[in-house]
A protein has these predicted regions:
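Glycine/proline-rich loop-helix segments at beta-alpha junctions forming the active-site rim
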Residues: 2-9, 13, 91, 95-96, ...
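Glycine-rich, small/polar surface segments that engage phosphate groups of diverse ligands
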Residues: 67-95, 99
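Short, charged beta->alpha transition segments
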Residues: 46-49, 87-88, 167
Length: 261
C-alpha cells in the first residue's frame, strides 16, 4: 500500500515528467545545501533539504532539523525518524514512497523552536518543493509546520483532521492533514497513542484529497484497481476527520525511488 506514482498522479500532473521533477528537486536541494539566506546557516553542520520519492502523492512537512538531522543532512533520523517509520508501517507504507522535508532547513540552536524570520527565510524552498511534487495531501508534523498551512489553529484541537491548503503555500489544490511531531510523541504516551491513531487515518485522507482534486472518478481505476471504492468520495470539510479505511490504497511505484538530499 503506497502513495507512489501511477494513474492517480497523472490526473494531477500529466505535463510534468518524473525526470523533470527529479531535476527540479535536485536543483532545490543544491541551493539549500549552499544557502546563506537565513541566520541559522552560520551554526549548521549540514543543511537538510529533504528526501523521498519525486512522484509521491503525500509530502510530510516537519518543523526544523535536530541534532541528528544536522549531522546527517537528512530529515527525521534518530528516534523521531524511527517512530515516523513505525507510523508509516501501520498503513503499510515505506519511507521512500513519500517525501519528507521541514519548514526550516537548518538546525536552530539547542533544538529550540524556529523563529518567524527563520521560517520566512526558508519558505521559498518549501514552496518550490511543493509546487514541483504537487501532492494531493500534505501531512504536517508539529505545530510550527501546521501553523504554516493552518494559521491560528491549535494542534490539540485539529490533529487527525483534513483542511484545504491556501494556494500561496505552493501546494495548489492540496489538503493538509495535521499530526503531532514524532518528538512530542516520544515525550508522552498519550500523544504517541493519538499519533498512531492519526497515522491510521492518512490513507483515508489521501482518498479524500484525490477526490477533491480530480472530482468524481472511479477511485478503483485511479489506484490501478486495488482500491475498491466504486462511488464518488465525499468532499472533505474544513474540520473533517477522515473515516478510517481498511481498503488497500496502492499505486504502482515508479521504476526507481530516488532520494534527494
Amino acid at each position: 500500500m503506497g502513495p507512489g506514482s501511477g494513474q492517480a498522479h497523472t490526473q494531477r500532473g500529466a505535463r510534468v515528467t518524473s525526470a523533470e521533477r527529479r531535476a527540479a528537486l535536485e536543483v532545490i536541494a543544491a541551493e539549500v545545501t549552499a544557502c546563506t539566506r537565513g541566520r541559522l546557516h552560520s551554526g549548521r553542520t549540514k543543511a537538510v533539504p529533504g528526501e523521498g520519492h519525486m512522484d509521491t502523492e503525500v509530502v510530510f512537512v516537519g518543523e526544523a532539523p535536530g541534532m541528528n538531522e544536522d549531522r546527517a543532512g537528512r530529515p527525521f533520523v534518530g528516534r523521531a525518524g524511527d517512530l515516523l517509520v513505525r507510523m508509516l508501517d501501520t498503513v503499510s507504507w515505506k519511507r521512500d514512497e513519500v517525501f519528507i522535508t521541514n519548514v526550516v532547513k537548518c538546525r536552530p540552536p539547542d533544538n529550540r523552536d524556529p523563529e518567524p524570520d527563520e521560517i520566512e527565510a526558508c519558505l521559498p524552498y518549501l514552496q518550490r518543493q511543493l509546487a514541483v511534487i504537487d501532492p494531493p495531501l500534505i501531512v504536517t508534523l508539529g505545530r510550527h509546520s501546521m501553523g504554516r498551512f493552518i494559521p491560528g489553529a491549535k494542534i490539540s484541537q485539529i490533529h487527525g483532521t483534513s483542511h484545504p491548503v491556501d494556494p500561496t503555500t505552493g501546494a495548489s489544490g492540496a489538503m493538509v492533514y495535521a499530526m503531532y511531531h514524532p518528538a512530542a510523541a516520544l515525550r508522552s504516551s498519550d500523544v504517541e497513542r493519538q499519533s498512531f491513531d492519526d497515522a491510521a487515518g492518512i490513507p483515508a485522507a489521501l482518498l479524500e484529497a484525490r477526490a477533491r482534486r480530480i472530482g468524481p472518478i472511479d477511485v478503483a481505476e485511479s489506484a490501478n484497481g486495488r482500491a475498491r471504492a466504486t462511488e464518488p468520495l465525499p468532499l472533505p470539510k474544513a474540520d473533517h476527520r477522515p473515516t478510517p479505511t481498511t481498503e488497500s490504497i496502492t499505486m504502482d511505484p515508479a521504476p526507481d525511488a530516488p532520494t534527494f538530499f
